[in-house]
Every structure is written in structure tokens, then in C-alpha cells.
């Protein structure tokens, strides 16, 4: 299964970053691919959904995520997370702080996709 792939929801293209069940090593490898794909897209053009359901973290994986999130910021219009309960709070807060981005959390992919492709960005889950 490709961990980084484009899907369509409500006629809009969304980059799905599927970390579900990943180990820290897999997260680091996937983030290399995320950086390559996202930085090749036009500025402020991407909708991204990252699924962290059942993911294992360590500091090096979390550090790689925050660096890529900072580099990707100019290309991402909206980003959402699913399975964020797998991310230790300290890593989640460091991710947002370092990248100067907000990552709304959703319970399901469907909820996240509806928010990403909807017009109302104010109704984000937390």
C-alpha cells in the first residue's frame, strides 16, 4: 500500500498521508516522500489528511515530522489529522509550534475529509 497518495473527496484532490500502524522508522521514510510530493506542488494548493491511527512514535520521528511540516507550510492550504491520540501531547504541541501551523484533529477520515473539502474552516474539531 502506498502511504502517500492522492485521493478525491467531493471532487477535490486530497493528499492522504497514511501513517496508520507505522513504526518510527516507517514514519521517517514516509515523511521523506511527503516532503518530495508536497514541495513539488504549487503554493497554497494542497489539502492534506494524515492518519496516525495506531502509530508508534519516538523523538527522531517526531522531529522529522515537524521539520517537514515547516518546509511544507507554503504549499498546504488545509491540513487535518486522524488518530492523533497516538501522538504524544509533547510531540503534537512541538509539531504545531515549530511549524507555525495548526493541525485540527478528527475522529474519522470521513469527518476530516468533509472539513478539508468544505467551505467552513471555522468548524474544525479539536
Where are these regions (language model features)?
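Amphipathic, Lys/Arg-enriched alpha-helical "gate/interface" segment within cytosolic domains
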Residues: 1-126
Amino acid at each position: 500500500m502506498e502511504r502517500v497518495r492522492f485521493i478525491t473527496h467531493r471532487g477535490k484532490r486530497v493528499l492522504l498521508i497514511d501513517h496508520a500502524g507505522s513504526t518510527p522508522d516507517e514514519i521517517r521514510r514516509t515523511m521523506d516522500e511527503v516532503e518530495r510530493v508536497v514541495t513539488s506542488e504549487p503554493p497554497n494548493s494542497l489539502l492534506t489528511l494524515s492518519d496516525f491511527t495506531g502509530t508508534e512514535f519516538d523523538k527522531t520521528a517526531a522531529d522529522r515530522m515537524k521539520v517537514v511540516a515547516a518546509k511544507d507550510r507554503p504549499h498546504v492550504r488545509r491540513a487535518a489529522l486522524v488518530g492523533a491520540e497516538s501522538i504524544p501531547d509533547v510531540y503534537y504541541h512541538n509539531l504545531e509550534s515549530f511549524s507555525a501551523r495548526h493541525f485540527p484533529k478528527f475522529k474519522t477520515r470521513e469527518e476530516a475529509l468533509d472539513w478539508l473539502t468544505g467551505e467552513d474552516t471555522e468548524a474544525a474539531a479539536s
